[in-house]
Amino acid sequence: MDHTLLYRPEWKQEWHILRTQATDYKTYYAFPALTRCENNVLVTVKSGQKHWGDEQSSLTQVTLNAPKQQVQDVRVIYEKAGFTPQMGEIVSMPNGDVCVYIDMQQCETNHRTGLWELRSHDGGKTYPVNRPVGVINGIEYGYAMDLIAKGNQVWMLVMTFPYQTGGRDREVHLITSRDSGETWEFCANLKELFGFSFNECALLECDEGFLIFTRGETDRHDRKSSADDFASGQHLVVLDENYRVLRSRDYRATTDFFTLTGRPRLYWIKGELCLFTRQWNEDSHNRMMSCDLFRIDPCTLEILSRVRLDEPRFPRQDGHYPVVYTQDGLLHVITYITCDRDQRETFEQKCDLVQLSYRLDEVLGYGKENA
């Protein structure tokens, strides 16, 4: 099988759920996350002015009726002067609550102020609980990057920062809750366990324990610019239930096509292990990016197929924190994409919240022709 072969879907639909044009290009919609609540899909998205360092911003929730493919509701669920809800990871808890874990930052900086929780008891209609997560085993965490529920237990990937309580450096830790997020406890320091630095990452359950995909980064003590991260590894790691590494693969080292990822997500879809991620090209100045799907063998960690879901659109565009759901034979990818109003601007160019849709059997069938 030619692992470098790139597939492009024949059928694709694009729906701009929230358009910055409707706000006279004042709003920068970015960083979606989602959870499924029966027929509804709850999507959180930052409504700000730029990628980071907003003067003011809010966290918006969009409620989609999945079977009808309609927007049911759009409303702000968090807004506070002086603070930026940079991203809100949303999860359906085992007890039925919907929780949002916000990467809270000071306005006009990317200085984290501690992980923040919103909690709903009515399927995301209201969020009466609004509170800091606080210190967990001596550490206050910032960025929440992924959550999974398995039975009555929940796990979350979170990052430490040296200026927060107990934070020695930028490290990704795995924490867990047995009471639907009311209390949390430490599981593992993944930076120490894996032996390398990384930032954005994805978490998924598997028969052996856990799958974690990591976006490598240069150690901040040695990092001169974001271009340095292009040399970093992009690993898929398998852990057992006791958080011991069983096997791993670095796709930067073992393929000639895998580049620096952005905000990866792992899913089981119809029994297939799927990685969705932004892929930068090697030209870090122009920052041409695509949104790609990789189908992976969970035993060998071999890439079975790669599908280009969205082509690069402009130099120095922003976008592609892909989150997905399926409905009636279609794969729906919710992401954010730079609008095409003014290509002369860079990262302050405004973005739309977008849904890209594909035929599920088509995108999962690529690479199986000669299998």
Predicted regions and their residues:
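Asp-box/BNR beta-propeller blade signature and adjacent active/binding-site loops
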Residues: M1-A371
